[in-house]
Structure formats: C-alpha cells, structure tokens
Amino acid sequence: MEYGLDLEYSFNEFLKGFGLSSEIAHIIWLPLPMLLVLVAAVVGVLVTVWLERKISAAAQQRIGPEYAGALGVLQPIADGLKLLVKEDIIPAKADGILFTAGPILVLVPVILSWLIVPFGQNLLISNVGIGIFLWIALSSIQPIGLLMSGYASNNKYSLLGGLRAAAQSISYEIPLALSVLAIVLMTNSLSTIDIVNQQSGAGILSWNIWRQPVGFIVFWICALAECERLPFDLPEAEEELVAGYQTEYAGMKFALFYLGSYINLILSALLVSILYLGGWGFPVPVELIAKFLNLPINAPFLQVFTASIGIVMTVLKAYLLVFIAILLRWTTPRVRIDQLLDLGWKFLLPISLANLLITAGLKLAFPQFFGG
C-alpha cells in the first residue's frame, strides 16, 4: 500500500484551485523539478561542508570555524563568496574549450542524478521507472570530465591526476553496479520507489541490509572511491600531485569540482539509504503507528505525518553515512595507487559478482525472502 503525498499531483491540484487548466499547471511545473534539485543539492553541500569542518576540528582537538555566524554556520557561504570573486584564470598553453567544459561535465551528471532520489512515497522530482539504470549511466560520464580537465590543463600533475581519477572511477564503477544489480534482482524493478516499497513490510527487519550485507559493504566502499574520499583520494593527493586535475583551476571552476564532490557524497549516502536502509521507511511498520494513534491507515493526518517524518528518516539515514565518511577521511591513511586498483579489480569485483550469483540462487530457493 502506498502512503504519503504525490508532489506533482498536489502542485497541479493547488494551481487548479485558482482556475488554471491542467495544461497550464503542467507547464508551470516543468521547470520546478530542476530548481528543487539545485536548491536541495546546494543546501545539502552547505550543511555537509560545515559538518566536515566541525567534525575534522573535533578529531584534531581544534575548535573549527566559529566567527562566521553562530558556531561558524555561515563559513561555507563565506567560502563560496570568496571563490566567486576570485579571478578566473586559464593557463596560456591550456586548451580553453576543454578546460572550461571539464568542470561542467563533472558537475552536471551528478546534479541530474538527484532527479531519481525519492525523499518519501511519491515525493520525488521525477518518477523514472528505470531510475537505477539512469543513475549508473550518468555516473559513467564523470570520468570523461575528470580526464578532460587533467589533459586540457597542459600540466604533468594535472594529467596524472586525471588519469588516476579515470582509472579509479572505472575500477570501482563495475563492482558498484554489480552490487546494485543484486538489489534489482530481488526487487524485479529498476525504480527507486519500488525498491523502497519492497523494504516496507516488517519495518527494520525487512531492510535490504540484512539480505545484502556484502552488497552493502561493497557499495559503500565503491561509493567512497567514486567520491574520491580518503583513503581513496589518489587523484588529488596533495603530497604527490599538488591538487591533481584541479591544480590549474581557480575561482568558480575550482568551486564546481568542490561542489560536485560534496553533491556526489550526499547522493551516494542517499542512495545507500534508499537501497539498503529502507529509504523513508520507519523502523516499525506504518500499520502499528496507525493502530497506536487509533487512526485508519488512509487517514489524511496519518498520510501527511508519514510523508513528513519519511523525509526526516531519509535525510537522517543519509547524514549518518555522511558522518561516517567524514570520520573516515580524518582518521585513515591514504592507500597507494596499486593497492587501490588491486582492491577494486582483485577483491571487490569477484566478491560483488559472487554476491550477485548467490542472490540469484537464494531467490530461486527462498522466493518469499529474496523476491519472487
């Protein structure tokens, strides 16, 4: 059974109340999804940057930012304004077109991937039936932008960083996709909505993390590598490559890389929440909540309540994972490039492939637990 609100339907019905036709209401709705995505992504980045600076300060027994607003909450905005007013420099011997296109090609696919993220039942920007396939396809574009940025800079450190970034992204893209395929196999759907609904039967006990513990670990490791977070930040290792493919960038072009990295981290955490932790699902079944409140399951108040708390649950699970990623960055050493590639090709790839085959076998043997 479906609970919650349909964002597009509710908006169109609201406009119809003012006498507008269905066609005009739909036209007004069309540009809003991308605007909502941009606002959600930017706000998420501001919160995550502030959290990272505060958590890293606590890990190193420092205070962290505290002067830009209360507890330094305005520090990310100050950083953004600083980068906005800095001079935009293109090196004399760089390829200007590729140099400019690189950061855009890195950022745009990550933002578009947010279109398939559901924050609640029917509360998503675009209900694409092949949402998982779309996300995997969009994420495969990013290595092209990274390699393009490194090559166009005409700098040896940038080129090495770009090559490392492309190799790392390709190496971890395959086990990541295989771990997601195991979820798709159990759900019989590529829709993120269907994947969450499949985990809503018995509260926390029906979450995919219990049926796919290996897939969960593989996905999270690969997601951190895709986001180039420590211990997988080889493409921009300061001690070796200055700043990797970002070395020659300044101002807003550098900010686009910075923005893309954090948006990708939040997106990865949201996808882990959706695929393995029940998404907007409660730890207890909604039927028990309705019984406790003595309300029918389709009561309007209960629908609004579950939709609102569902958003909080999705974001809370995602930021718990972001917190873990930040702690890992400031408490683990960087691996070598050969160790990085060995982990991806010699360990995670065979493990994710074996996990997919075992899931297929378990689905045939126990269809009631692993999808029919």
UniProtKB/Swiss-Prot annotation:
GO terms for biological process: aerobic respiration; photosynthesis, light reaction. Its EC number is 7.1.1.-. It is found in: Cellular thylakoid membrane. InterPro entries: NADH_UbQ_OxRdtase_su1/FPO (IPR001694), NADH_UbQ_OxRdtase_su1_CS (IPR018086). It catalyses: a plastoquinone + NADH + (n+1) H(+)(in) = a plastoquinol + NAD(+) + n H(+)(out); a plastoquinone + NADPH + (n+1) H(+)(in) = a plastoquinol + NADP(+) + n H(+)(out). GO terms for molecular function: NADH dehydrogenase activity; oxidoreductase activity, acting on NAD(P)H, quinone or similar compound as acceptor; quinone binding. One of its GO terms (cellular component) is plasma membrane-derived thylakoid membrane. It is an enzyme of class 7 (translocase). The chain crosses the membrane at residues 27-47, 97-117, 128-148, 176-196, 204-224, 266-286, 308-328, 347-367. It is a multi-pass membrane protein. Keywords: Membrane, NAD, NADP, Plastoquinone, Quinone, Thylakoid, Translocase, Transmembrane, Transmembrane helix. It comes from the Bacteria. NDH-1 is composed of at least 11 different subunits. Belongs to the complex I subunit 1 family. NDH-1 shuttles electrons from an unknown electron donor, via FMN and iron-sulfur (Fe-S) centers, to quinones in the respiratory and/or the photosynthetic chain. The immediate electron acceptor for the enzyme in this species is believed to be plastoquinone. Couples the redox reaction to proton translocation, and thus conserves the redox energy in a proton gradient. This is NAD(P)H-quinone oxidoreductase subunit 1. It comes from Prochlorococcus marinus (strain AS9601).
